[in-house]
Structure formats: C-alpha cells, structure tokens
C-alpha cells in the first residue's frame, strides 16, 4: 500500500486547500495510456508503477493514473507536486519548508484522529486500529527526494515518501536523502511528536516505517541524456523541415520570487494558493527541438543509412536527391529530416566525391571501394573528439602524393555552386586551389559539418527542461521557435 497515496485520499477532506492539493490521479478512474516499460515511483502518488511520459517535461515520471491530471514538477501552478519540488541548491531553510508542508497538509493531532475514526468506523470490522484502515496516518516526515540532474547546476528535487525498492536503472531520476543536510536528531524529534498523537496500536508501525525510510542511503545521481526523453511529444514541421516539441504546462498569473516565498504564502496566505490553482490554465508551448542531443542522434542515424557508394558514382545531382539507384538511394530517410542535416550531407558527400574521383581511378557507384566504411565512420565521428583522426584516415585513402615533404591531393571541383562558395569562404581565397593538403582538407570538412550548427551554443537537452517562467519569457521574446525559409534549390540551373 502506498502510504502517500492513501494520505492524499483521506486528507483531501480536511480543508479547502487540501481538496485541491490532494486530488491526485491515482485516486480517480484509470484512463488507458501507453507506458514506457519503465518501473519506478510515480512522483505524484509515490507508488511503484509502470511509468509513462509526462506532457510537461517529456520524461517518464508519472503513472497511467496520475498522467490524466497533466501535472509536472516544472509547472508554476502551486499544486502538490510543485510544492514538493525544490531547485538546487538545497538549504536548511528549504528543507524546513518541506517539513512545514507535511505538517500543514498531513497533520496528525487529536482532532484529525477523531475525525478519521468517525469516517472509518462504519462496520465492526473497522473498529480496531488496523493498518488497512489507518495507513494514511502512518505518514512519516522524511527528506527523501527524487533528483533530476539536467546539468551540474540544474538539478530538481521532488520530495516524497518513496516506499519499498525498485530497480530504477531506466528511470530518469535517483532517490537521495537529505537528512544529514538538515538535522537528524531534530527530524527524529519532529516525527516523535507526530507519533505521540497516534493510538498506541499504530505507534510501532509509524516508528518502524520512519526509521526504515529516513536512514536510506542516497543513490548516485544520474545524468539525464536526450535518449531519456520521449518521442511522443516531437512534431516534425513539414513546412520549415525542422523538428519541434509540444510542451504542456499549468500556468498561473500569480508569481513568486523563489520557493521560500511560495511556502510563506502556504502558511500565511492559503487563499492566494487556492486562487492560483483556480485560475491556472493548461497551456501548450511549441518549442524547437534543436539541441546537441538530437543532433548526435540524427548524425548516428545518418551514418547508419548513409550510402557511401555515391562518392564513386557519376550522378550529377545531390546525394539526397538520388532515387532510382539502389546503391545510392537515401531519399527514404531524408524525406523527414532537418533540412540542415540534409544540406550538410549533400555538401560533405559532394566534396569527398570530387576529391576521391580526382585522385583515385574508380568506375561507378556499384564499385567496391575501401573508403566506404571510412565515410560512415566520418559521419559518425562528426562533433566528436575522434573527428580529426577519421578525417586523416579518409585523406590517406585518396592516394596523396608528397610534394616538398607535404602530402597533398588533387581537387577537380564539379558544378556544385554551394560547395564552391563554401570552399572559398573556408580557405579565404578568390579561386579554388587544385591541390589540398591535410589541414585544408580537414578545415573544409569541419566547415561543412558546422555550417548550420554551432555546437558551443547548442543546448544539450530539449527545451522541455526549462521552467514555465523561462518558457513564457522565451515565447514573449520570440526565441521559443525557429523559423527558416524553405530550401527550394541550390541553383536556378537545377530546374533548367
């Protein structure tokens, strides 16, 4: 039995604030939703279940019951999941606020116990203090939290009562314990005070549960990667040929400077929180999905589908436009891919083709060449530390000759105007040289790969990890989405 889930079910009848805060999806009707085949703790009801992705952050951290409430720990609506969320760094004041939250929402005193006795004693079998009927009173205050590590300084902690154990190797979070950052003896005293109000039959169960959960060791934090995010919220814009992501958040017009001000209103101005929850709107943000994680994933898929036979072919068109050649056709893959990746693939394959055919005697695209595996490796090594080594291996497979102690290759350029301009810009020359050394060859390859992507300025993870306040600010400034003109043609001569 999930104690936190039971506590939300019973305590929601205490106050007007509890009726809104403790209304979780796990205590309502189940709606069929696909799960992510990941077992873990649902952050909203704290029970172990099959997790599904959240519509707010695209990470699997809610169960199929709670996902219907559409709540995320990154919302700015002060629902219970948001109130249990604290951003790094953790301070003693923030931990004290979490303890005050438990005491306000889930109090244990004589008045509350008498009320639950009247509610529960409906038949003779419920007259005794059985755990089955009073499990919601066995809610100890612990400082365990599910930690999300987006970056070294971008961490979120969702506090809750995470009972039992489960292999969370595939979950995006790890359970950490902050009892040492607070005060172990002080937390014991707070729980002993709560326990003293319980009937004698329930005290041992409360104490056992508290000491088991409050002394748990912290797990090593897990770095969240792009592969942890679901593909269900990704939308491909067929007009701009760019991927985007739908982000849904609960947005309220009320603002708080930090968590401490929010918890202050929880204690002193409960009507403000009720008004914020009543006036919140479920808002959709459409954001671009241009980040380093997606770039690496797309490059890996491109290397898998790449057709290196193109470098030995006599096709006059771009590599992405070849459709009826079984050795060079890749159009099936590039039809729904970012146009920047498509342009990079065209220029890179055209450049290697011109260099290779200028130095090696080859036949046509059905030929078997030793350079083919290297071209796949070259694409896979883009934006990695192995890029220079792979470029040198590709260069050495083009039969370079030594001129005055420097290995060079010939370059007889084709009719690709985009490649012509790119080489001129990279080498900063007025006319294209017919001889290239390794440094020039490497500079051109790197320039083509980084033509549309500045890796240093790319975010590592999707926009769905941004807070709601950041998303609103970016939407108002127009930086939430990217708009590009369609690439109709590289040259007007292509249609002639």
Curated annotation (Swiss-Prot):
Molecular function per GO: metal ion binding; RNA binding
Coiled-coil spans in chain: none
Mutagenesis or variant effect for residue 486 to A: Abolished interaction with host IRF3
Annotated region (Zinc-binding domain), positions in chain: 42-79
Span list, region Important for cytoskeleton localization: 82-177
GO cellular component assignments: host cell cytoplasm; host cytoskeleton
Taxonomy, superkingdom: Viruses
Protein family (similarity comment): Belongs to the rotavirus NSP1 family.
Oligomeric and partner information: Interacts (via C-terminus pLxIS motif) with host IRF3; this interaction leads to IRF3 degradation. Interacts with host IRF7; this interaction leads to IRF7 degradation. Interacts with host CUL1 and CUL3.
Protein's name in the database: Non-structural protein 1
Species of provenance: Rotavirus A (strain RVA/SA11-4F/G3P6[1])
Taxonomic classification: Viruses, Riboviria, Orthornavirae, Duplornaviricota, Resentoviricetes
